[in-house]
């Protein structure tokens, strides 16, 4: 927010400080200063001069010799300017003075340009007459300045006056970084109020008088708002007998200091009020409005609309439009239409000052690709109470500047006025929060400076509507801190005893999973929880898949981020595809992230948020590489040897025959497999990719960090090797389940040591060999005892069609 010091002083006349002092103190009170720009930088010894006499240069056709009265003397200046005449009043830099830059409008040197007396083609010159560019400004800010040549004053100045002061350049502009919650500070009145409070000076806002003739505005225009949620307030007034002319110099100078080019009285008034009150306004030519009616409604999807800049734009049903009885005439809060623009021959004007929903304006501006100064203010969320105040101020300026005749009355559609916010005054809690000892009287004095009221009967602070950032005790405490002075708050250490922290069990389990993954060469990542509905098709999920029942985002960033994910694989596959596209040959990634499973749609209660650990890899790896990593994780969580792998076809995104569900005690904790070839194509990947997804809410209760010590075995073990022949479709997991079930407590371990398929085995069969280890803790086992157990195992294996290999 740019704030010219001279404009601030118009509302705080007793403000007596340098621009830097102003900036520093405002920063300490919470308005962070970005920069200070001095408009008179490098402008030294520049006065008003009157050209008394002009003669031709004897040796140069394009030069003239001027005798210039600079107040206390008349000096001779040689110039090539084509636009000066005798009697003109011009800015003159005297010998030894300095200007900001050259007349070519290029970048000004840091230290300006020093002017010395000298000779031009043999004739002495004791100074220089200045163009507006040499004074560090431009024709955009001073439209009356000539395109080429010397600036000529058209106001009441006299020789010897300070030319910099006369041009309004004896000023400084302080730029502040205003946070979005302080909407009131995006206006000169708001910043002046802050300055008055900071420096303990009186604040004098503009005194707005009643305007309007004896006519009734309702005879000129009717207003209907169809969507009060998107337009909580709409005000309108009518001005007739418009007289376009340049705005007064004081208004032009203030706008110029803000970086706004003066145009004419009508445009300048709307810009001036927008900067003064922070309320954007718009003007329509009333004669172009059909049926003399304004309708505020949503656009229809696909509507085409041409804005003031001549661009045709496509609307959707979320964009709010300003319409007349037949057509759209403006995009609410963003830009008016070319079909209702104000031209030089305008006779009757409709003024609009409204409050639009900030979120809708921001999203609409993004959708149609158009952002303006007005939309930038609206999207922050304006105070509805400010709309009519700004409207009345604009109409007052219309009358004061003779720009037209204001019709009596105003249209004000405001069905749901803002409710007054009241907060309990809790001084003790404020002091406890801040570490201060401020009295109630001091607190109320601070609040009075920023126009916060106080109801003594209820001990409540009354928050004005323009302070939309004050909602709770902590917000009020911050206001106390700002004016008490952050630098005055003593530095103290917190009281209390230090206690040793302890991680929750769930976090400890996640840390173990991370550590094991990283020890196996995996890198952690994080992807968005927002996804596109198109993900379901990429993952080959059927139309009736429960994963398609996803929560929709009410205000998404775009279609690609419009739902909450119900399956965690898309982010992992996208990351792997990106790495593959960058020719990374061997990649291992893991991610911890939630999936969001709604209990019902539309939502009636919070969804089930389930943390998933997703692992993905490609390159020098296969199914069993990833299976080994998962088993490492389970071993580290005290779950080694408890898991079972069951082939599955329930996951359409996994390769059939190369996918398994992982269960512990009959409960599924994860799934693992190779990505389906069609899914690989959908993500533009080649080769083989393996993934595993662990459901942490199911895994965590089963994990344990308890470890029992067992001494060295006192009794010898007995080993039995079993070489078995079976059909290829029998999985080793089925064999191992039988080993555990029938081996009992005496089966210490089992180990797969050979798998064979070849000429010596019947086609469609395979040979699998296991080593079984038996041991008793309290005795030496007998051969017959072990043989009996092995027989039980073999009997059960025969039921699967498994035979001992001859």
Residue ranges and their predicted role:
Residues 40-44, 211-213, 498-503, 527-546, ...:
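Beta-rich nucleic-acid/ligand-interaction surfaces
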Residues 449-452, 469, 599-603, 608-609, ...:
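A carboxyl-terminal module marker
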Residues 24, 64, 203-304:
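Glycine/proline-enriched, intrinsically flexible loops and inter-domain linkers
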Residues 48-78, 159, 264, 270-339:
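Conserved mixed alpha/beta core segments that line enzyme active sites in large multi-domain catalysts
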Residues 1-215, 350, 369, 373, ...:
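Phosphate-backbone binding interfaces of nucleic-acid-interacting proteins
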Residues 423-585, 720, 773-776, 781, ...:
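Extended, well-folded interaction surfaces typified by the phenylalanyl-tRNA synthetase beta subunit core
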Residues 121-130, 134-136, 140, 145-149, ...:
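Mobile "lid/hinge" segments at catalytic clefts and subdomain interfaces of large enzymes
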Residues 199-225, 402-430, 437:
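Terminal amphipathic helices with adjacent charged low-complexity linkers/tails
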């Amino acid at each position: 927010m740019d704030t010219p010091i001279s404009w601030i002083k118009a509302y705080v006349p007793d403000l007596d400080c340098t621009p830097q002092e102003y900036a520093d103190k405002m920063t300490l009170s919470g308005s962070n200063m970005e920069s200070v720009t001095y408009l008179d930088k490098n402008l030294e010894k520049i006065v008003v001069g009157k050209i008394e006499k002009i003669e031709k240069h004897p040796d140069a056709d394009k030069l003239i010799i001027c005798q210039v009265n600079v107040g206390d003397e008349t000096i001779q200046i040689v110039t090539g300017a084509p636009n000066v005449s005798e009697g003109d009043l011009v800015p003159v830099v005297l010998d030894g003075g300095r200007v900001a830059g050259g007349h070519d409008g290029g970048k000004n040197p840091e230290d300006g340009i020093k002017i010395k007396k000298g000779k031009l083609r043999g004739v002495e010159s004791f100074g220089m007459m200045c163009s507006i560019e040499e004074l560090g400004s431009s024709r955009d800010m001073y439209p009356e300045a000539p395109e080429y040549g010397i600036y000529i004053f058209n106001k009441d100045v006299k020789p010897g006056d300070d030319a910099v002061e006369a041009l309004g350049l004896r000023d400084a502009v302080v730029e502040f970084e205003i946070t979005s919650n302080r909407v009131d500070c995006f206006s000169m009145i708001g910043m002046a109020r802050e300055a008055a409070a900071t420096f303990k000076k009186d604040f004098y806002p503009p005194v707005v008088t009643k305007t309007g003739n004896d006519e009734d505005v309702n005879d000129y225009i009717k207003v209907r708002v169809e969507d009060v949620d998107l337009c909580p307030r709409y005000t309108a007034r009518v001005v007739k007998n418009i007289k376009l002319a340049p705005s007064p110099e004081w208004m032009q100078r203030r706008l110029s200091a803000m970086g706004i080019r003066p145009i004419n009285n009508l445009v300048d008034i709307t810009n001036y009020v927008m900067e003064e009150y922070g309320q954007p306004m718009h003007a329509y030519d009333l004669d172009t409005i059909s049926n003399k009616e304004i309708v505020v409604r949503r656009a229809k999807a696909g509507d085409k609309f041409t804005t003031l800049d001549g661009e045709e734009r496509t609307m959707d049903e979320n964009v709010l439009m300003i319409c007349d009885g037949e057509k759209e005439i403006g995009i609410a809060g963003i830009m008016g239409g070319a079909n209702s623009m104000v031209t030089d021959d305008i006779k009757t004007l409709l003024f609009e000052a409204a409050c639009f929903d900030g979120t809708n304006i921001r999203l609409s501006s993004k959708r149609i690709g158009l952002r303006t100064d007005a939309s930038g203010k609206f999207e922050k969320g304006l105070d509805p109470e400010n709309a009519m105040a700004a409207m009345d101020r604009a109409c007052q300026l219309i009358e004061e500047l003779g720009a037209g005749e204001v019709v009596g009355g105003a249209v004000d559609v405001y069905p749901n006025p803002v409710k007054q916010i009241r907060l309990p005054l809790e001084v003790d809690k404020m002091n406890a929060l801040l570490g201060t000892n401020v009295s109630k009287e001091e607190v109320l004095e601070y609040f009075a400076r920023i126009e916060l009221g106080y109801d003594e009967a209820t001990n409540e602070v009354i928050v004005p509507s323009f302070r939309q950032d004050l909602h709770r005790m902590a917000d009020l405490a911050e206001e106390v801190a700002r004016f008490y002075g952050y630098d005055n708050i003593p530095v103290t250490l917190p009281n209390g005893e230090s206690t040793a922290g302890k991680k929750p069990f769930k976090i400890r389990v996640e840390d173990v999973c991370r550590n094991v993954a990283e020890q196996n060469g995996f890198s952690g990542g994080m992807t968005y929880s927002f996804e596109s509905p198109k993900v379901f098709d990429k993952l080959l999920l059927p139309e009736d898949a429960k994963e398609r029942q996803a929560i929709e985002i009410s205000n998404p960033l775009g279609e690609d981020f419009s739902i909450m994910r119900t399956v965690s694989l898309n982010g992992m596959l996208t990351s792997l595809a990106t790495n593959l596209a960058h020719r990374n040959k061997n990649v291992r990634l893991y991610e911890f992230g939630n999936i969001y499973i709604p209990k019902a749609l539309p939502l009636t209660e919070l969804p089930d948020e389930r943390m998933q650990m997703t692992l993905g890899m490609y390159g020098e790896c296969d199914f069993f590489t990833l299976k080994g990593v998962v088993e490492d994780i389970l071993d580290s969580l005290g779950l080694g040897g408890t898991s079972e792998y069951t082939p599955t076809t329930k996951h359409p995104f996994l390769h059939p025959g190369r996918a398994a569900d992982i269960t512990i005690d009959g409960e599924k904790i994860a799934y693992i497999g190779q990505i389906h070839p069609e899914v690989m194509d959908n993500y533009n990947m080649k080769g083989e990719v393996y993934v595993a997804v662990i459901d942490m809410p199911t895994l965590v209760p089963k994990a344990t960090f308890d470890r029992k010590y067992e001494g060295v075995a006192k009794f010898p073990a007995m080993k039995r090797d079993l070489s078995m022949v079976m059909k290829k479709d029998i999985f080793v997991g089925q064999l191992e389940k039988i080993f555990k079930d029938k081996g009992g407590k005496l089966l210490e371990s089992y180990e797969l040591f050979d798998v064979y398929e070849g000429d010596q085995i019947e086609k469609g069969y395979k040979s699998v060999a296991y080593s079984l280890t038996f041991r008793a803790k309290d005795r030496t086992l007998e051969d017959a005892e072990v043989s009996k157990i092995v027989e039980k195992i073999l009997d059960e294996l025969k039921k699967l069609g498994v035979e001992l290999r001859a």
